[in-house]
């Protein structure tokens, strides 16, 4: 099962992706988690991403795609995965399409989550960040 979960920041992608991942025993892959893991493990891609992040800049699409592609090669992705919040740009979508084609991967589903702007503001405004791992969470959602 190979799923992509799309939606605005705060729409609940991560929350729903975690539930689906647990139910089907597949990894939940988010770009934030990939960045944190690669930085923590001192990988070359992680070091490159950290340079941009430390400057408050967005990590370039090409580097994000490289990190995603590297993650797809992990053993735990052999039976599927749920990709949370990627692609975010047209360029990322085109690159992902190329990667999936090259790797012979067919998606099972693409799920879009919609939320009204008031709900998004409430979710984003109440986000907290774990001091130990850097993951964001919300006490209510």
Map each language-model feature to its residues.
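Glycine-rich phosphate-binding loop of ATP-dependent small-molecule kinases
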Residues: 1-141
């Amino acid at each position: 099962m190979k799923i992509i979960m799309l939606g605005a920041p705060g729409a609940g992608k991560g929350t729903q992706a975690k539930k689906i991942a647990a139910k089907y025993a597949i990894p939940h892959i988010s770009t934030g988690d990939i960045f944190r893991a690669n930085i923590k493990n001192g990988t070359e891609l992680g070091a490159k991403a950290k340079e941009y992040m430390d400057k408050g800049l967005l990590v370039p699409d090409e580097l994000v795609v490289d990190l995603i592609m590297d993650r797809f090669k992990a053993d735990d992705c052999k039976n599927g995965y749920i990709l949370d919040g990627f692609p975010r740009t047209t360029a990322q979508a085109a690159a992902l399409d190329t990667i999936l084609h090259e790797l012979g991967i067919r998606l099972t589903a693409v799920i879009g989550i919609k939320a009204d702007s008031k709900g998004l503001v409430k979710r984003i405004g109440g986000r907290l960040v774990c001091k130990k791992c850097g993951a964001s969470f919300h006490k209510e959602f």
